[in-house]
Amino acid sequence: LLSRRQRQMCIRDSKKHIIEKYNEKGYRDAVLVEDSVVNYNDKRVDIFLKVEEGDKYYLKDINFVGNTKYPTEQLLYILGMKPGDVYNQKKLNERLTTDEDAVSNLYYNNGYIFFGADPVEVDVENDSISLEVRIQEGPQATINRVIINGNDRLYEDIVRRELRTKPGMLFSRDDLMRSTREIAQMGHFDPENLVPQPIPDPDNGTVDIQYNLVSKANDQIEFSAGWGQTGVIGKLSLKFTNFSMKNLLNPSTYKGIIPQGEGQTLTLSGQTNGRYYQAYSISFMDPWFGGKRPNTLSVSAYFSKQTDISSNYLSNNSYG
C-alpha cells in the first residue's frame, strides 16, 4: 500500500502527465481547474479531475533566425514540422534538442558546443501559431584536455586508444558517444556509471572532455569436480581479461599473481576423467596487436591424453 505522501506524489505526477498529453495534441492552454480524491475503499481511491482544454492550435509558419552556418531549408527538413501540423510542444523540443538527429546535433557534431535554440511564438491568430526559432551558433570549439578519472585497472594509454575525442580535434557529440560505447565494450568499466562530461570554456573557445569511470572485475573462474569409477572427474578454467604480455617477465609490475593492465585475454583450462583422460589448453588474445590499430591476434594450444580402458592403449594429441 502507498503511504499518504506517496499517494499525493503519484497524483501530482499524474496530473502533470495529463496536461503534457493535452499539449502534445495541440491544446497548449490546457489547465487543471479542479481535482478531488475520494476513498473508494481501504485500498483504492477515485480521482476526479476537471480540465479546461482551451483551443487546439496548429502551426501557421516556422522560421529560423540567427543561423549562418546552415540554411533555413536544411534546418526545417531536420525539424520535420511544417505549417498545418498540430502544435506539439514536446515534439518541437525533441526535434530541436533531444533526438539523436535533432537540429542541435547538426551543430554539436561540427564543433558548435555553445549552440542554443529558443523557439518563440511571435504571432497567435485564432487557432494558428507562427513560430520563430532563434539560433545562437557561437564559435566552433576544439578539444583542449581529455581527462580520465577512476581507471585503476588498465594502463591509461589502453583506454585512450579507444577514444575518438583527442586534444586539438573539433568537438563532436557523435565522437563523444562513440568513445563512450567503445570504453563500455572493453568490459572493464561499469557502463551504467559511464557518463562523459563536456566542460566548455567559452572564453577560449575550447572544451575539456572528462570521462568518469567505475572499474569492475570481469575475470572468470569455472570449477567442477566429482568422483567416478575411473577416479576424480573435474574441470578448471581460468580466464584473465586484463593480462599484460609485455610484463610477463617483470614480476615487480604484477597485480596479484599475473601481470595486468593491457586488456589482453589469457585463458587456462584443464579437465580430467580420472587416469584415462586428461586435456589442457591455453589461449591468448590481444585486441590491439601492434598497438596502433584494433587488429586482433589469437593464439591457442591444446594437449590431451587418452587411455583406452579395455586395451590400455595410450594416445597423446597436441596442437597449437
Model-flagged regions — what are they?
Residues 1-11:
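Single conserved hydrophobic/aromatic residue that forms the stacking wall/gate
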Residues 23-39, 109-123, 169-174, 181, ...:
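Short, well-structured beta-strand/strand-turn elements
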Residues 153, 169-320:
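Gram-negative/organellar outer-membrane beta-barrel architecture
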Residues 15-19, 72, 76-79, 93-104, ...:
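Extracytoplasmic/secreted envelope proteins and their assembly/folding machinery
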Residues 40-47, 124-131, 202-208:
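A short, glycine/Asx- and small/polar-enriched loop/turn
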